[in-house]
Amino acid sequence: MQALLTEILDEVRPLIGQGKVADYIPALAGVVPDQLGIAVYGNDGQLHVAGDARTPFSIQSISKVFSLVQAIGHSGEAIWQRLGHEPSGQPFNSLVQLEFERGKPRNPFINAGALVICDINQSRYAAPALSMRDFVRRLSGNPEVTVDNHVAESEYQHRARNAAAAYLMQSFGNFHNEVEAVLRSYFSCCALRMSCVDLARAFGFLANQGFCQHSGEQILSPRQSKQINAIMATSGLYDEAGNFAYRVGLPGKSGVGGGIVAVVPGQFSVCVWSPELNAAGNSLTGIKALELLSERIGWSVF
């Protein structure tokens, strides 16, 4: 496995320079673009890494999975009264569909859906951002996971579109807490800094029927774990989820920090990171690396 991961990174490295680092969040615009790492974590506890797998980066929308897991953990099926689990086919920050569907987001991985989930968590936790940080520390086994407050503040200063979505949902009665407070919590979650190793370990429970191997916790039921993997497969890469399913064939979740996590149910969780994005906001080199890994090992849910 180690040799294969190194070989794949060497093969995809020439793609660096063809994408573009996220620049609509000023604090992310200065990320060194030629970094590349991958980590594979098995249900047997074995870890395989290559490249910059231990370098922390901003996880951004990957955090939406953790928020969803928290909400399901304390509220169960009730959350689906406020949002759906269908693909949107629209950009992740679209307002048009949200207006047309009367303030009920299509799924928890577009921004509007993630804001509803954060609103649900805001009603549950006294300090939602700290609760999230502590949760991912447990999942990853890394007590050093932190929030990059500079990134969180930068996102808050450029919050107009997310605020518009939240106020639009509030106008339809689907947002219950103070919008600015929820936005603060949301951006703090997005600004968590984790490495490929951290994320591969943190997603291990989704490859293991909801059981976290290194903490010994049953995070979700097997049924709930299957459901989250299904939503990741249909909606985890914004409006490029179909292309990812076609090329990689695994449940996945991306973030504009350049990370992509993928799950091989019953076997492995994987995280790849390369900061340059394609036009859909997903790591250009990261998708290719996962495609090659899936092809050469024969991993696919299809």
UniProtKB/Swiss-Prot annotation:
InterPro entries: Beta-lactam/transpept-like, Glutaminase. It catalyses: L-glutamine + H2O = L-glutamate + NH4(+). The keyword Hydrolase applies. Substrate binds at S61, N111, E155, N162, Y186, Y238, V256. It comes from the Bacteria. The keyword Hydrolase applies. Keywords: Hydrolase. HAMAP family: Glutaminase. This is Glutaminase. It comes from Ectopseudomonas mendocina (strain ymp).
